Amino acid sequence: MRELAQEQAPITINTYKEDIMNTDIKQAMHVEAAKSFSSAEANENERRWNDDKIDRKNQDSTNNYDKTRMKLNFEIGTDGKIHTLGYHEKSLEVRLQERLSELCWKPFKPDSKIQPNCCARFIFGGNHDRTIEMAFGDQTVNLEKDADNSHLLRCEEIEHWAKDVYDWCAKRYGQENIVGFQVHLDESSPHIHALIVTVGQRTKSGRECVMWSAKFGKNRYEYGQILREMHTSLYEEVGSKYGLERGDSIEGRNVQHLHKRDYIRKLTKDAKQAEKAVKGLQTMTRRLESQIFRSQSQLEEIEKSLASGKIALQEYEIQKTR
């Protein structure tokens, strides 16, 4: 019996918010259930764009695609090796459909109000400063729009990290089910996009089939448990090797469900609020420093007066403790 569609898995916003604040060096992993995958999404992941398309995308204030860094993007192919991004002859959505066909997956009728989940979309990342360091080492990176970063070279550490994440995914979901694994170094923070078909076995026949619940549980409780275990496993097998702490799960948090555009807008808003908070702290620090300077000046004047005999010792002790 075909598995019924489940509610789309949430994208958690907590870890990346902490990355912007630079309070923790954490890994980040977000997973979302998908009922389809469009050619537009595939083109974005594989950067099958011309310059005009990139310029149009960058007109949106939430986007920052650096054309001078796009040559540094890469992907890990079905052979488990590093390749230039977009090296496949077939596009990502075509490869996904081929894998689904191999598993005899069929969606519900077109007019159905619900559809089964056919794959999982992952984003792997981490603390901004740490991932930038893994990708570019001590090279100077200008993250402003239209900046020229053509001098940058890709460091091996980001390749090792990506390969370790790939191996982690392959062990959990099967290498044959990793349809796409793209690493983007041309945006604000280096990150990975992984498109994975979730496969299980039919109870009676034992045949492999597309089955979301086989990997992510049959309900929210099971999903929460699995997600927490995934964060721990990813940290133990990958993150700890690169100085990244365990990421946050959804347990005990007010997790919001956001589409990508709304998610990026929230991150931008959080960044501005963080910048405002820092400026407030800087103002407070300057005021405290000014107050300390005035107090020190007053104390020096009192000590001079004491030395010249203008005030008595008892009066000096009283003024000193004020």
Place the predicted regions along the sequence by residue:
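N-terminal nicking endonuclease/strand-transfer module with a His-rich metal-binding environment
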Residues: M1-R322
